[in-house]
Amino acid sequence: MRHTRRNIFYHELIGLRIKIIEYPDKSLVGLTGLVIDETQKTLLIETNSGRRVRVLKANGVFQFMLPNKEKVIIRGVQILGRPEDRLKNIVR
């Protein structure tokens, strides 16, 4: 199944380009990079300079670039949980 605007909530986010749109720590707003790890509550982002930043999903609004170059803005609370658990929710 391909990443699309409609099903991104049920996909693993590792490997997608990301930009932080809103976050309580204003120094992280505008940060761009690649999602290199995902846990139930956090995303680990590697910036172009190689810096790694772990952010809480629930605290932010993120813009993801899908493989087809489409950009999708998502509130972090919408992607809480592990990818496999998010998938189980849609299957039920």
Curated annotation (Swiss-Prot):
Primary localization class, coarse: cytoplasm
Record localization: Cytoplasm
EC number, UniProt record: 3.1.26.5
Cysteine-cysteine disulfides: none
Top-level enzyme category: hydrolase
Keyword Transport carried by entry: no
Any GO CC annotation of this UniProt entry: cytoplasm
Reactions the enzyme catalyzes: Endonucleolytic cleavage of RNA, removing 5'-extranucleotides from tRNA precursor
UniProt signal peptide: none
BP GO annotations: tRNA 5'-leader removal
MF annotations from Gene Ontology: ribonuclease P activity; RNA binding
Any Pfam family matching the protein: RNase_P-MRP_p29
UniProt keyword terms in alphabetical order: Cytoplasm, Endonuclease, Hydrolase, Nuclease, tRNA processing
Subunit and partners: Consists of a catalytic RNA component and at least 4-5 protein subunits.
Family: Belongs to the eukaryotic/archaeal RNase P protein component 1 family.
Protein's job: Part of ribonuclease P, a protein complex that generates mature tRNA molecules by cleaving their 5'-ends.
NCBIfam families on file: RNaseP1Mthb
Protein name, UniProt field: Ribonuclease P protein component 1
Source organism (scientific name): Staphylothermus marinus (strain ATCC 43588 / DSM 3639 / JCM 9404 / F1)
